[in-house]
Amino acid sequence: MKILRKNHPLLKIINHSFIDLPTPSNISSWWNFGSLLGMCLVIQILTGLFLAMHYTSDTTTAFSSVAHICRDVNYGWLIRYLHANGASMFFICLFIHVGRGIYYGSYVLSETWNIGIILFLTTMATAFVGYVLPWGQMSFWGATVITNLLSAIPYIGSTLVEWIWGGFSVDKATLTRFFAFHFILPFIIAAFALVHLLFLHETGSNNPSGLNSDSDKIPFHPYYTTKDLLGIFLLLLVLMILALFFPDILGDPDNFTPANPLNTPAHIKPEWYFLFAYAILRSIPNKLGGVLALVLSILILAAFPLLNISKQHGLIFRPVTQIIYWIFIANLLVLTWIGGQPVEYPFTTIGQIASITYFTIIIILIPVSNTIENNIIKL
């Protein structure tokens, strides 16, 4: 009898992706974060679906509907906090996943890498529109400030902002369309994630040594399914600790106040996972320049395959670039910290230095260190 999973038209696809997939035998736990991102997406879609059953996207009732979910719906408080903190877990996994891709040179698989960048941008868009939905003070003013950035685009900026708002300010029309976007985007992310996997399985996965591993492959199941399961259990453990013991630790206190267009919060800031980009935006005094820097802070990831001139794959045997990489990570943490600080001395100066360092490392220092290491190999 033929094995069903190898011959059935649908099961065959699953088999080649998750069961009989030839996988390098030496991939470490840093490769777990792809499956963890998949798990985060499933959690977000499921919890979001149950929240959407009780949420109303109207400016007069949105805030009270969130309060109703937490107070009156069975385990509504848990679903809400799993969804809110699940977003933070999603971005933690996302940052580690991208960081691992940079460290181990996964950007040489350019199609997979570029779809990954699209996924990153789509996830950021989803998180942004989702943050507006509770209609608290920070939701409202965050939406106002960030959407207003589009007015920096020459000629069409103001029209574009009013088109997105659906009026002359952030109001009912904005909230309704943001809810619609927040509902549909995760499914688009899921579709892109499948394309991401498709391209990855065309070339095969990278491995920590950066060497060709064709001669040393093992089946994905049971070796990496069990390894992924361990990662998933650890992720769920951290998520449950966050949701049950520290549910509001990553939120903003201003969001416990209903949105009020007549009262501006002292410090408008986005969620913690956007702070690095927000710090870069604020570091440039010119509005259009700030918006361009903000967009480039993410799109510069697409430059990694173009700027790669190293003769070695990944940073495992490249000590000079390793040092620069860890300076880059430290710099990102500094930017995240600065993004949450008020716009005053010395924070503005530190932010400007960190922003310049961010782009300098990627555009200048990494290619220079690649050249140095290439010359060392020749010695």
From Swiss-Prot:
The entry's keywords: Electron transport, Heme, Iron, Membrane, Metal-binding, Mitochondrion, Mitochondrion inner membrane, Respiratory chain, Transmembrane, Transmembrane helix, Transport, Ubiquinone
Classification via InterPro entries: Cyt_b/b6_C, Cyt_b/b6_C_sf, Cyt_b/b6_N, Cytb/b6-like_sf, Cytochrome_b, Cytochrome_b_C_euk/bac, Cytochrome_b_N_euk/bac, Di-haem_cyt_TM
Topology within the bilayer: Multi-pass membrane protein
Keyword Thylakoid: no
Cofactor(s), by name: heme b
Residues the record lists as binding heme b b562: H83, H182
Transmembrane segments: 33-53, 77-98, 113-133, 178-198, 226-246, 288-308, 320-340, 347-367
GO terms, molecular function: metal ion binding; ubiquinol-cytochrome-c reductase activity
Bound cofactor: record note: Binds 2 heme b groups non-covalently.
The UniProt record lists the keyword Isomerase: no
A GO CC term assigned to this protein in UniProt: respiratory chain complex III
A Pfam family the protein falls into: Cytochrome_B
Location(s), subcellular: Mitochondrion inner membrane
Any one GO biological process: mitochondrial electron transport, ubiquinol to cytochrome c
Residues engaged in binding heme b b566: H97, H196
Annotated function: Component of the ubiquinol-cytochrome c reductase complex (complex III or cytochrome b-c1 complex) that is part of the mitochondrial respiratory chain. The b-c1 complex mediates electron transfer from ubiquinol to cytochrome c. Contributes to the generation of a proton gradient across the mitochondrial membrane that is then used for ATP synthesis.
Miscellaneous comment in the UniProt entry for this protein: Heme 1 (or BL or b562) is low-potential and absorbs at about 562 nm, and heme 2 (or BH or b566) is high-potential and absorbs at about 566 nm.
Similarity comment: Belongs to the cytochrome b family.
Name recorded for this polypeptide: Cytochrome b
Organism, scientific name: Akodon reigi (Reig's grass mouse)
